[in-house]
């Protein structure tokens, strides 16, 4: 554990049951934690920083992360957290249950423009799992790899912690592999439950839609991560809710 992380955890303990808040700042002397005062009217439920604290942190160096805690709460960013994180364009570090969870500032899961290898179906899958607390590797992938004798999903899923489950056992958070104009599975979608999936296909914005007969016919197999737990879907749901109310 770094000195910065120790300072973050100590500050959260001192503030509990209220939420702590602060910044990780990169200074000429190295990375340090800059604690702030939570000026929220409901500090046990929300956090709010003063503009003065934000300015003082910026004067110390480059802000590299915003930090807050969920005392007795859940280790995923809330709907409000995700909305504010995207606005801040910063990584957010969350203190919960004596640990620090670090979240990259990924775009909202819905409404993304498609760019192969940058914001495509695998990026959406990877970012959704990141918000759920599971890290998936990034890797280079040429466009149309499925037409060049490659089978990237089937060749890599087991090595990254997933295993195949029967389609009849589908649970929210499972990954659907589909054949989209291909003889091999070349498209990943997140099953959301209630007959819905979350995915990103070329020339469209990422979206939730019904898991219709069309997509059921295209489905090759269903996969689940070994570290997955049902409550992890909360992290994905919170982002979907944040995006639906984002103005």
Regions found by a protein language model. Name each.
Residues 58-74, 205-206, 210-221:
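Extended, compositionally biased flexible segments
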